[in-house]
Structures are given as structure tokens and as C-alpha cells.
């Protein structure tokens, strides 16, 4: 009995090209969805961490009479006396948040992290000394202060913003602007009433509080009112 063996035919070049085109098309369709899902996850983490920062901020304000302020550094160091020295200058939001750690109110560095273009890896939670606490790239939130680098207190307008992310960064920070691409045109903010919300970022990179009012708008009928100049204290980028 004669057995016939059929040779298995391989793919032709045309068939391989068709398969490649189909795979590329599917990848092109799914890539935007994957990016949106990633951005949404990063935004959700930012909201969660902002809430934790809010609890620490308001406990600090109750204890010291204002949110982190340069004048409070020595007070914290005297009252707590730990190895972690509270900064007496606030030139970055890292400095402001280090006061929360030095005061023993914040017990983790990771609440200050959120994924942005300038903060790319979570802190290691080693902050026993100042040089170890909240290093470059550990902090995703900017911190808002008033005229003359003076901290706000909870007695101000409840609609004022205390911390915010993601800030516009391309080698340096762009004043008063937010990164539209990071969280799909959303800015995550902690307000003075200890609420966390996501604001729309307009085409100019400005966060919109409501109606036509932007976050940094000043004067009558704004949350800042007359005579207050809100200033964003930026994080130390990676």
C-alpha cells in the first residue's frame, strides 16, 4: 500500500504582509484605549493620594495654625526634636511636605507621589534624615502659597486650592499651566474645604474652577479675592 504525503504549504509573502497589516491595524485601534486606561489609573491614584495629603494637611493646620510655612520650621524642630529636620525655607513642595513628615503627622512619603512627567517613581519611605526625605522625583503635587511665600490657613475661602497636579513640565515648569496629556485634560486638586476634585484643563493648559473662572484668576468674584496672589510652589523634578 502506497502512502501519499502531502507537503504543508508555507505562508506566501503576500499572506504574511496581510497578517502584519491586520496586526498593525488592531494595535492602532487598541493603543489609544490602553493609554486612556493608564491615564485614568494614574488620575485615580492622584485622587486617592491627594485625599491622604488633605487629612495630614488639616491635622497640621489644627496643630500649628496654618498649612506648611517657612516660619514653622523651627517650631516643629523644637516641639518634635526628631532626626528629620523640618525646613525653614519652602522653595519646593518637597520642603512643604517634609514639614508634615518632620511633625510626625504624615507617616508615609508615598501619599505625596502621583505619576507625572516630573515624578516617575514612588518614594522609598526612607525619611529619617532630611537628605533622605522626599528626594527629586518623589513628589507629584504642587503646593499653593499666598503673597510673600506665606501659607494659607483653613479660614480662607473654601474654594481655594491647596495642592494640584499634574503641572506642565518640559525641562522646566510652565507657570499656571497643567499637563493636558497626563490625565486626559483633568487636573486633580485639593481644596481648602478638604475636598478633592478633578478640574477640566482648557486648551491653554489652565485649570477651570467653574464657568469661566480659572484657578489662578484674581480679584472680585474669584476664590482668591482682592490682594491675594496665589503662587504655585513646584516639586523638585526627577
What does each model-found stretch correspond to?
Residues 61, 68-69, 111-115, 161-163, ...:
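Structural recognition of the beta-strand scaffold that forms the well-ordered cores
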Amino acid at each position: 500500500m502506497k502512502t501519499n504525503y502531502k507537503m504543508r504549504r508555507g505562508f506566501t509573502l503576500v499572506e504574511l504582509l496581510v497578517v502584519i497589516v491586520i496586526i498593525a491595524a488592531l494595535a492602532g485601534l487598541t493603543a489609544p484605549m490602553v493609554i486612556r486606561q493608564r491615564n485614568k489609573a494614574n488620575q485615580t491614584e492622584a485622587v486617592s493620594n491627594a485625599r491622604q495629603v488633605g487629612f495630614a494637611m488639616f491635622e497640621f493646620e489644627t496643630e500649628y495654625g496654618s498649612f506648611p510655612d517657612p516660619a514653622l520650621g523651627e517650631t516643629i524642630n523644637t516641639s518634635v526634636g526628631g532626626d528629620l529636620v523640618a525646613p525653614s525655607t519652602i522653595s519646593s513642595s518637597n520642603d512643604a511636605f517634609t514639614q508634615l513628615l518632620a511633625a510626625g503627622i504624615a507617616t508615609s512619603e508615598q501619599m505625596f507621589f502621583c505619576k507625572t512627567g516630573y515624578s516617575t517613581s514612588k518614594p522609598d519611605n526612607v525619611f529619617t534624615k532630611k537628605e533622605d526625605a522626599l528626594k527629586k522625583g518623589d513628589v507629584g503635587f504642587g503646593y499653593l502659597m499666598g503673597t510673600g511665600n506665606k501659607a494659607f490657613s483653613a479660614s480662607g475661602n473654601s474654594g481655594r486650592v491647596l495642592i494640584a497636579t499634574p503641572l506642565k513640565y518640559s525641562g522646566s515648569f510652565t507657570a499656571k499651566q497643567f499637563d493636558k496629556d497626563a490625565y486626559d485634560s483633568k487636573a486633580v486638586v485639593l481644596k481648602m474645604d478638604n475636598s478633592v476634585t478633578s478640574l477640566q484643563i482648557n486648551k491653554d493648559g489652565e485649570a477651570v474652577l467653574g464657568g469661566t473662572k480659572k484657578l489662578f484668576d484674581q480679584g472680585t468674584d474669584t476664590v482668591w479675592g482682592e490682594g491675594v496672589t496665589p503662587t504655585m510652589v513646584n516639586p523638585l523634578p526627577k
